[in-house]
Amino acid sequence: MTPQFHRFAVEELLDGVYFAPTYGNTLMGLATHKPRVPEDNYAIIYYPPLPRAMIEVVDPDQPDRVVEYGETGRVRLTTLTREFFMPRFLERDEAEREPPCDLYPWDGVRNVRPFSRFQAAVVEGVY
């Protein structure tokens, strides 16, 4: 979801309704969004459900290197539950790395979208 659509949804489509975007999958569960504040310019920022899942944003060409805050990279997920461990799984998404905030004191992701190198082949949707 783009910041432009987020603004449209909040101000025009769903005026007066609380809009709660989510990001997730079967491995991670649902990442919650950071409550909207004006300085975020309608960017949607998600924080994973720690300690179950940890998201990192890594250099697509060097997936062992985490990018700096604000830089774009590929989303890498680590999941750990009593029944399951999936370390460092490269997702089909890219995003900007977002610093921790008061509500979520761990890294998040901003402006999640399909990984651009897969753009022609990625099928989007709700599964």
PLM features per residue range, with description:
Residues 1-127:
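Active-site glycine/GP-rich loop and adjacent strand/helix microenvironment
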